[in-house]
């Protein structure tokens, strides 16, 4: 009888955590649904810039851009009618923080990304920042994550590109937890 009770409690706890934890995290402000005004910018161009750094310090642990810090702005810009390009410091495949897609952290935009072959191709084949002219974009967005701490702030090329875009009156922004 005691084993059956323990099993019932364990199953109930697992179900609560699996189904209830995401709702609780949303209630506390993690990945809330935004129900504000929807803005349209048809014909606009946005550039999302991410890290190329894939390892957390000397730990050997995989890292990169935090999923939702790249996917949420991508879909906001895309849904607003903008053309969206994706670039990284070195170009090529963008490393994504593997923990950012775990069920309790994944945002709706992350789930959308996992079903979007067009965006996935952009992430696997990102443009190299030095091959771009940032002044040709209306918005330049820097996506955060642990990897960004290793190369975004130390890239002279990124610094120059952002400086030119800002001087040209472009919108420059970013996010990092």
In which residue ranges do the predicted regions lie?
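Extended, subdomain-level signal for the structured scaffold at the beginning of enzyme domains
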Residues: 1-168
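A contiguous pocket-lining binding segment that forms or flanks enzyme active sites
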Residues: 165-177
